[in-house]
Amino acid sequence: MMRSLNRCSKHRAAWLLLALTTFSLELVALYFQHVMLLKPCVLCVYQRCALYGVVAAGLVGAIAPATPLRFSGLAIWLYSAWEGLQLAMKHTDIQLHPSPFVTCDFFVSFPAWLPLDKWLPSVFSASGDCAVRQWHFLSLEMPQWMIVIFGAYLAVAVLILLAQFFPPRKRDLFSR
């Protein structure tokens, strides 16, 4: 299994599939925001940024998947999935255990050199409250689904990382 994962990580289609699935989740988030009129909170916006990090990882890996450049994509993937998982767990904790002492920020804070909330306010502006439960599906709230999603992305990234230590076998059909 690890050898086949190693072989798969060296193909462009796998990296593009990663970028496509994550970008699809971004489109779903924009649907929730602009069509269903759910208000994203600060942690929701940060989780979106983590998803965009996974999209970027897929695109970096797709540039040259058979070269060591894929390790850069893998590092971005691991970091983004880990940060997204941490944010989703924090968001879930705020929703499940509301407290006046534990809240999220009122405004997103991006670096001065990358003010995404000013450049694309329709995507990166936060107007909701982190403690408000706005949507659920199959008895899980939105941040709980994000735990599942980021956990799956992280688990697959770790498996791909471990698979790099198992070189694929060369198929020699004519030697005996």
UniProtKB/Swiss-Prot annotation:
GO CC term (a single one): plasma membrane
Disulfide links within the chain: 41-44, 104-130
Transmembrane segments: 15-31, 50-65, 72-89, 145-163
Keyword annotations: Cell inner membrane, Cell membrane, Chaperone, Disulfide bond, Electron transport, Membrane, Oxidoreductase, Redox-active center, Transmembrane, Transmembrane helix, Transport
Gene Ontology BP terms: protein folding
Alphabetized InterPro entries for the sequence: DiS_bond_form_DsbB/BdbC, Disulphide_bond_form_DsbB, DsbB, DsbB-like_sf
GO MF annotation, one: protein-disulfide reductase activity
Gene3D superfamilies: DsbB-like
Chief place where the protein resides: membrane
Residue ranges that the UniProt entry lists as topological domain Periplasmic: 32-49, 90-144
Family matches, as SUPFAM superfamilies: DsbB-like
Pfam families assigned to the protein according to its UniProt record, in alphabetical order: DsbB
Species this chain originates from: Sodalis glossinidius (strain morsitans)
Protein family: Belongs to the DsbB family.
Gene: dsbB
Protein name: Disulfide bond formation protein B
Topology relative to the membrane: Multi-pass membrane protein
Keyword hit for Transmembrane helix: yes
Compartments where located: Cell inner membrane
